[in-house]
């Protein structure tokens, strides 16, 4: 398989097809859909603990009280399908119940939220096929930093966007602000995926590969979100089957689909670098031939 791809790269015929074959081979070898299923399961298990920890962080900083409400609505409006309002009510009820837990239960919530971070780390390093492991203390520090600073940075960015929105009275900035707010979810997804693909793997990732893979993942995520919402709106047959429980399979499928997109972006990032190495090796062999 690699020899065929190498030959195609050597003769510079149909390089895109050769790259796509390499991408498909990696997806198959890494069992990407199985990894996505594992991450979806852990995500659903960690969803309420993760949201509870995030809301607790915002509660600890009074200056983010207004921003936390905006961030909550922004997340459910832009990162969940059309039934986000229903899911939001259920999750907020679960989080309210979790606030009544004891200190031991609160520690359990934090551990469960960190479990999601560990699963993401493990899945991405499986795709990058990295054998190097971080020290446990360092990994815990990174997970905790993401868990604590991530929501605060998101809240700060949302506060900035709200401030820009308040400047709409300035006619000269009106069009610019509208365009920025319109593409803000895409930019946020792009930056998030880029950081994920650049920081989490324990090996060095070329920045341009991470940017390309993150951009493709962000585009697929936004397109998938709109397509999924359109399907739910136009073909509501799931409601006839599941009734009031319809929100459960919708959330399951959406989380699984989201992780498929995230891991596909990672596979694209890896394949770009691997194909470039194969092409360089093929060109070197061509130069060495008499």
Swiss-Prot record:
Keywords: Cell inner membrane, Cell membrane, Membrane, Transmembrane, Transmembrane helix. It is a multi-pass membrane protein. Coiled coil: none annotated. The chain crosses the membrane at residues 44-64, 104-124, 140-160, 183-203, 210-230, 244-264. It is found in: Cell inner membrane. Disulfide bonds: none annotated. It comes from the Bacteria. GO terms for cellular component: plasma membrane. The keyword Transmembrane helix applies. The keyword Ubl conjugation does not apply. Its main location: membrane. Belongs to the UPF0761 family. This is UPF0761 membrane protein YihY. It comes from Shigella sonnei (strain Ss046). The lineage of its organism: Bacteria, Pseudomonadati, Pseudomonadota, Gammaproteobacteria, Enterobacterales.
């Amino acid at each position: 398989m690699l020899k065929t791809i190498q030959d195609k790269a050597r003769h510079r015929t149909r390089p895109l097809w050769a790259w796509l074959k390499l991408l498909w081979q990696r997806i198959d070898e890494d069992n990407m859909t199985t990894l996505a299923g594992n991450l979806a399961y852990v995500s659903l298990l960690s969803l309420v603990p993760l949201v509870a920890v995030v809301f607790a962080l915002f509660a600890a900083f009074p200056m983010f009280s207004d921003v936390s409400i905006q961030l909550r609505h922004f997340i459910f409006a832009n990162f969940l399908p059309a039934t986000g309002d229903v899911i939001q009510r259920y999750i907020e009820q679960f989080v309210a119940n979790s606030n009544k837990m004891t200190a031991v239960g609160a520690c359990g919530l934090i551990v469960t939220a960190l479990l999601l971070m560990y699963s993401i780390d493990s899945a991405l390093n499986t795709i990058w096929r990295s054998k190097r492991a971080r020290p446990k203390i360092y990994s815990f520090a990174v997970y905790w930093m993401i868990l604590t600073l991530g929501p605060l940075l998101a809240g700060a960015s949302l506060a900035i966007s709200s401030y820009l929105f308040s400047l709409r009275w300035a006619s000269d900035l009106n069009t610019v602000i509208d365009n920025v707010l319109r593409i803000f979810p895409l930019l946020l997804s792009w930056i998030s995926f880029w950081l994920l693909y650049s920081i989490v793997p324990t090996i060095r990732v070329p920045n341009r590969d991470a940017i390309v893979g993150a951009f493709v993942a962000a585009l697929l995520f936004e397109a998938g979100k709109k397509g999924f919402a359109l399907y739910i709106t136009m073909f509501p047959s799931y409601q006839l089957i599941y009734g009031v429980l319809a929100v459960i399979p919708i959330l399951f499928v959406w989380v699984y689909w989201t992780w498929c997109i995230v891991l596909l972006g990672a596979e694209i990032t890896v394949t770009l670098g691997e194909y470039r190495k194969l092409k360089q090796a093929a060109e070197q062999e061509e130069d060495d031939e008499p």
